[in-house]
Structure formats: structure tokens, C-alpha cells
């Protein structure tokens, strides 16, 4: 009887790591393995593209239970970079991001939908320009595993679109330029 109990305890302890809950990750900023880029139609003739150079965040993810995932990201809106200094100054102004008043944007997930094959919809709240609105991000789990330095990583891509006016951005560049497309690449290092 003691042997059976001991064997059961050893077996349970070996299986416990497999049944563990979601792992926590920090977005890899130091290695530059993450990006937040944007694209806005320029009057319907071309596109203005850019990125945010300074952001941080973390997420919790378990491939066996993707609907339990959680995401938190903070973006330094002062770090907007469209590769044109005068345009960046205008984007930071009260016409757009109003960074003197709202130097940060945040996204906090509320629910995650599993669409199968690594495809997810991450629902959450985006706070931008002092306005908080629901936002859905179409995401894909790219992969996860050990890195060459002894860490463990997980990576995702994502896209979303939102109307500038929904976040109190009143600058009217015409109907062709009313929405912002975001492309996200996220690689996290397990804590």
C-alpha cells in the first residue's frame, strides 16, 4: 500500500509541471523583437507609415488554454516615428495624439477568442488620447520554445484597425484617411 501511494505521489509530481497554468512573459524590448507599426492613408493617394519606438508590456499565455490569455501594453506616444521630424511634431500635437496631455496609450485585454490553428481574437480596451474604447486584435500565435540563451520565448503577430474620431482625434484628413491600421509583432520572454 505504501509503495502504491508513493508511486502515485511521484507520478503526480512529475505530471504537475505539464498541467501548469499559463506562463507569464515580458515583451522583449531589449532584443528589439517586437514592434508596433501603423499605416494611415495619405489623402487616398499613398500611405504614411510609422512606428512607436518605446513601449512595454507583458502577457500570460498557455497554448492548451488560449482563451485564458491576458495582455497588457503601454505605449509612449511621444516615441511616434514616421521618419519625418516635422510630421512627427504634428502627430504629437493636439491635432492627433496630444502627447503633452496624454503621453501614454494602453491596451488591456478583456477576453480572448480561440479561432483554431493559432488564430486568436484578443478583445480589450485601448486608451488613446484620453479616450478608452473596446478594440479587437486579430492575432496569430507564431510559435514558442527554448532560445539559445537558456530562456523560453513565445511570439505573436496581430492586426487591427480603428477610426481616429473614436478616440477624440478631430483632425479631418478626408474619408480616405479616417482610419489607422496597426501591425503588431510581439515576442515575449518567459519570466
Curated annotation (Swiss-Prot):
Superkingdom of the source species: Bacteria
Keyword annotations: Periplasm, Signal
Keyword Signal among record annotations: yes
Pfam family, one: YceI
Signal peptide coordinates: 1-22
GO cellular component: periplasmic space
Entry annotated with the keyword RNA-binding: no
Subcellular location: Periplasm
PANTHER family listed in its UniProt record: PROTEIN YCEI
Similarity field: Belongs to the UPF0312 family. Type 1 subfamily.
Protein name: UPF0312 protein Sbal195_3198
Organism expressing this protein natively: Shewanella baltica (strain OS195)
